[in-house]
Amino acid sequence: MYNLKDMTLEEMEEFFVNIGESRYRAKQIYKWIYGKKVTDFDQMTDISKNLRSKLKEIAYVSQLKIEERRVSEIDDTVKYLFLLEDGNIIEGVAIKYRFGNTACVSTQVGCNMRCSFCASAIGGKVRDLKASEMVDQVMAIDSDYGKISNIVLMGSGEPFDNYDEVMKFIKIVNNPHGLGIGSRHITISTCGIVPKIYQFADEKLQVNLSISLHAPNDELRTQLMPINKAYPLEELMKACKYYVDKTRRRITFEYSLIEGVNDKKEHAYQLVDLLKGMLCHINLIPINYVREIGFKKANNEKVMMFKRIIEDAGISCTVRRELGSDIEAACGQLRRKYLKER
């Protein structure tokens, strides 16, 4: 059975041609699936009964089941656990900003990158998600929380470790006949898979790129993020400069401040030296506490010191506001707790 949500518009056009139907049927079906949120072929009333019968025999339109939903009493952030068709569990988050609602989407069940501060990495990667499973997260959040205007691929998993399905997902949600979410309202976050950064730059998309950096030197970054052994900072910075030169777009560098680990004054100056001259923005993140890992977030005084050093060097910098801290909003936390209790 074909899941129609796994198809870009072009792929769906080919699908209809291959089953002896007109190419324009794809736009009709896209309108029903993404415009009207219909999954039952019998409700697609401008499609002939014969075609509806044919589709029921060979295709379906997926939906995600919300297994659990937790609402923050602090800031209206909502954390979702979704049940996949094969019984696996993934997480999604809905976040309210002044500019609209953002869906934080997972790209894998678990993660292989083994970053030492991330709950998603505990237990490793189970499998990649299909494009449809990413699309379904956005649509489920949209239906439950309110219209989604922005997407961040910052949930569980490494997007560039599932590159092809992530690119397909972007095409589907970006298509005006699909969800119609603008490229500049979509952000991909990567821990730094260098060959994929070059490939992504060559796609010439207007999608935002965010790099999970978290350390200003190789020794510390390798301790925190094993990916740095394969792609050390010199290689990563070359790839980032290539991306900026190719796309003329700014990169955001994510830097989680961990008490006593990467929050010293010397680290701030090293970060400035690493990034000075690049078209970039630094997003400082007071790290979410994860019980199994034990890291604590840097205190506010150190966060502000770090920010001041960066801004004094002429680099754009913000501190990400804490969201959903009362509902275990750190990536991987809620899923891990659910699996333990099940």
Swiss-Prot record:
Binds 1 [4Fe-4S] cluster. The cluster is coordinated with 3 cysteines and an exchangeable S-adenosyl-L-methionine. InterPro entries: Aldolase_TIM, Methyltransferase_A, RlmN_N, RNA_MTrfase_RlmN, rRNA_lsu_MTrfase_RlmN/Cfr, rSAM. Its cofactor is [4Fe-4S] cluster. Its main location: cytoplasm. HAMAP family: RNA_methyltr_RlmN. This is Probable dual-specificity RNA methyltransferase RlmN. Residues 97-326 form the Radical SAM core domain. Specifically methylates position 2 of adenine 2503 in 23S rRNA and position 2 of adenine 37 in tRNAs. One of its GO terms (molecular function) is 4 iron, 4 sulfur cluster binding. Its EC number is 2.1.1.192. SUPFAM superfamilies: Radical SAM enzymes. GO terms for cellular component: cytoplasm. The active site is at E91 (proton acceptor), C331 (s-methylcysteine intermediate). Reaction proceeds by a ping-pong mechanism involving intermediate methylation of a conserved cysteine residue. It is found in: Cytoplasm. It holds the Pfam family Radical_SAM. It comes from Thermoanaerobacter pseudethanolicus (strain ATCC 33223 / 39E). NCBIfam families: rRNA_mod_RlmN. Keywords: 4Fe-4S, Cytoplasm, Disulfide bond, Iron, Iron-sulfur, Metal-binding, Methyltransferase, rRNA processing, S-adenosyl-L-methionine, Transferase, tRNA processing. It comes from the Bacteria. The keyword Nucleus does not apply. Disulfide bonds join C104-C331. S-adenosyl-L-methionine binds at G157, E158, S189, S212, L213, H214, N288.
